[in-house]
Every structure is written in C-alpha cells, then in structure tokens.
C-alpha cells in the first residue's frame, strides 16, 4: 500500500529512524532480523534474490521506476502499490530528516534477513555436484567497506559462494551492501 508522508516523525518509520545497523541485525531475531537496502539497483537485486521487504521508503520521483520491483517482491502479491507491504513516499526534505543524510539514491527498503545455508549444507551440495564449485572465504575482515568490495570482486571473478567467518564484518550492513552494489545477495 502506498502511504504518502509529510512528516518524518511517523511511528511507522521506526525501522528507518530508531535503529542502528547493529540493532537492525538483532531486532526480531526469531524472524532473522532486518537489513537496509539502499538504491534502486540494490533493492532490485535483493528482491531478485528472493529477499522479502518489510517496507519501502522513497522520493516520489522514484515511485514509477520502482513499481515493477515492488510488484515482484515477496509479500507484495504482484501489486505495484506493494499490496500489504507499506510503500512510504515522502518529499526529499522529509527523507533527509528521516535518514539523517541526503538520499540521493532515492530509495531505501527495510528487508528481512534471509536464512542462509550453513557450511555443512554448502559442502553437501558440492559433494553432490550441484553446488558451488568456486568458494571464497572472508576470514576476520572487519571493515564493512572491504567486505562489500570483496563480494563485488568475487562476483566479477565468477565465485559461486562466499563463506564469512564469525568475526568478519556483517555483509548485510548497509555500507557493505551499498559497496557491493547488491552482489552480496
């Protein structure tokens, strides 16, 4: 459903205003938490990977270009107005008051974190000949920008899967996702 906003203090925007990236990761842990997808390209890639949006937030000028992406998103029921998924539309100055920065990419989406396959599942698929043949491992890489760049490079090199060690920076952190241009999905 498209919801036009004139005020950034709307309670329905809590995913965008009240949570740090760390809190997004931990929030609703039973539902796998949240992450932010920023820019139409990244949102398009997240939706294409089957990630389900909680909501969209964008400037009016981006609504028409995002309608096909919204319609194809899980939970939107094929409706380009989002169906049951809120599509918040607000003027640029309201978006800036919500996010704290000029949203020059024009669109954000609060996405549910997907449940990822573990190492045993990945290895079993490799043994069965159906899984990843080229695997990269990011070990204890702590800078989010570097993690995003590593995923982008892995995609360019044709890497099939990337394993991330527990002490590695979160690949779904907003900056990692943005630097990767959505290749983390």
Task: Describe the function of each predicted region.
Residues 28, 69-82, 179-183:
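Short, conserved catalytic or adaptor-binding loops enriched in Gly and charged residues
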Residues 66-70, 97-102, 118-123:
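Short, conserved acidic/polar surface loops in the N-terminal third of protein domains
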Residues 1-71, 168-169:
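Boundary-proximal intrinsically disordered activation/regulatory segments immediately upstream
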Residues 48, 112-114, 120-185:
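RNA substrate-binding interface of SAM-dependent RNA methyltransferases
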Residues 31, 52, 83-85, 105, ...:
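Short coil/turn connectors at secondary-structure junctions
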Residues 109:
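Glycine-rich phosphate-binding loops that contact phosphosugars or nucleotide phosphates
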Residues 72-100:
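A glycine-rich helix N-cap at a beta->alpha junction
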């Amino acid at each position: 459903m498209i919801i036009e906003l004139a005020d950034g203090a709307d309670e329905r925007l809590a995913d965008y205003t009240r949570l740090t990236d760390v809190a997004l990761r931990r929030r609703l842990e039973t539902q796998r938490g949240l992450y932010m997808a920023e820019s139409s390209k990244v949102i398009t890639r997240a939706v294409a990977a089957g990630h389900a949006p909680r909501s969209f937030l964008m400037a009016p000028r981006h609504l028409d270009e995002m309608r096909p992406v919204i319609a194809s998103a899980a939970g939107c029921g094929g409706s380009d107005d989002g169906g049951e998924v809120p599509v918040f539309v607000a003027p640029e100055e309201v978006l800036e008051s919500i996010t704290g920065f000029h949203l020059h990419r024009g669109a954000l989406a609060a996405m549910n974190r997907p449940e990822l396959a573990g190492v045993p599942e990945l290895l079993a698929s490799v043994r069965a000949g159906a899984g990843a043949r080229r695997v990269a491992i990011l070990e204890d890489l702590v800078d989010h920008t570097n993690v995003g760049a590593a995923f982008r490079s892995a995609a360019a090199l044709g890497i099939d899967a990337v394993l991330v060690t527990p002490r590695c920076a979160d690949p779904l952190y907003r900056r990692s996702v943005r630097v990767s241009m959505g290749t983390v999905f």
